[in-house]
C-alpha cells in the first residue's frame, strides 16, 4: 500500500490549490492521501470531485476548531472514522490537526497529523499528549504520518527525543530518502515530515519527492511550487494474501 502525506502550507487559510496539485496526485497514485496544514470549506467541492476521479473516492476531514488547520484523508478504500483524538492543546490546535481513520479492507489504521508551531510549555504539553496517543496504539496495525515539526536524526532538534524514544520502543520511524521535506524562503531545507508505524506493520520504503516530471512539488519559489513541503511517500509491505504484512506474518 502506498501512503502519501503532504503539508500544503495553507496557514489557516482556505487557499487555492496549485494547478499542478491534481496531476501530481495522479502521478503519485497513492492508495491513501493525507493532506495537512489544509483548510476545508465550500471551495473544496471540486477538490473532492477531482480526488474521486483519480480513484480516491473515500474522504474524511478533521473538524476545524478555533480557525486552525485541518487534516483531510482520501483513500481508494472505504474509511471509517476512528476514536483516537488529537492531544488537548492551546486553542485546540492539536485536536484540529489530527485525524484517525480505519481501513477495514486492509485491517489497518492511519492517523494524519501536523504538530502545531507551539513553543515553551504549550509545546511540552502538546508532545506529552501526542506521545500518549501514539503509545496507547502500540498493539494496533497503525501508522501516524505527517508534519511532526522535528527530525529524529538530529538529536539536538527540539522534540527529536520523542521520535527517537519511539524507535527505541520498537516503532518504525524511517529516515526517508531525499534531502529535505520542508524548504524555507531562504532555501534552508529540513526533514520534519515523518511516519511512525507500529511494530505490527513493515515499511518497505519512505521518500521525499520534491519534483515529478519536471514539476516542482516543493520549492522556496512560491510562484512555481505546489507547497513548501515535499510529499512524504511511504510504501507498506503486503502479505501474499493482499493484506498489510509485518515481519512476523
What is the role of each PLM region?
Residues 1-11, 100, 106-117, 145:
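Active-site-proximal beta-strand elements of phosphoester/diester hydrolases
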Residues 10-13, 40-44, 66-68, 118-120, ...:
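Active-site environment of divalent metal-dependent phosphoester hydrolases
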Amino acid at each position: 500500500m502506498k501512503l502519501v502525506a503532504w503539508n500544503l502550507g495553507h496557514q489557516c487559510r482556505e487557499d487555492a490549490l496549485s494547478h499542478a496539485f491534481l496531476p501530481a496526485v495522479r502521478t503519485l497514485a497513492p492508495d491513501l492521501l493525507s493532506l495537512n496544514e489544509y483548510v476545508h470549506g465550500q471551495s473544496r467541492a471540486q477538490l473532492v470531485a477531482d480526488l474521486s476521479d483519480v480513484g480516491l473516492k473515500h474522504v474524511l476531514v478533521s473538524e476545524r476548531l478555533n480557525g486552525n488547520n485541518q487534516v483531510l484523508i482520501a483513500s481508494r478504500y472505504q474509511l471509517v472514522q476512528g476514536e483516537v483524538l488529537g492531544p488537548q492543546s492551546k486553542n485546540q490546535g492539536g485536536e484540529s490537526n489530527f485525524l484517525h481513520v480505519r481501513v477495514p479492507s486492509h485491517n489497518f489504521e492511519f492517523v494524519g497529523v501536523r504538530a502545531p508551531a507551539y513553543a515553551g510549555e504549550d509545546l511540552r504539553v502538546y508532545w506529552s499528549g501526542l506521545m500518549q496517543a501514539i503509545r496507547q496504539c502500540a498493539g494496533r496495525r497503525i501508522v501516524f504520518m505527517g508534519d511532526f515539526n522535528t527530525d529524529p536524526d538530529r538529536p539536538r532538534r527540539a522534540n527529536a527525543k520523542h521520535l527517537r524514544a519511539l524507535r527505541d520502543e520498537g516503532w518504525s520511524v524511517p529516515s526517508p530518502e531525499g534531502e529535505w521535506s520542508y524548504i524555507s524562503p531562504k532555501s534552508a531545507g529540513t526533514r520534519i515530515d515523518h511516519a511512525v508505524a507500529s511494530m505490527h506493520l513493515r515499511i518497505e520504503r519512505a521518500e521525499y519527492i520534491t519534483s515529478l516530471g519536471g514539476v516542482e512539488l516543493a520549492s522556496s519559489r512560491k510562484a512555481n511550487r505546489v507547497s513548501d513541503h515535499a510529499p512524504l511517500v511511504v510504501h507498506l509491505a503486503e502479505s501474499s494474501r493482499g493484506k498489510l504484512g509485518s515481519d512476523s506474518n
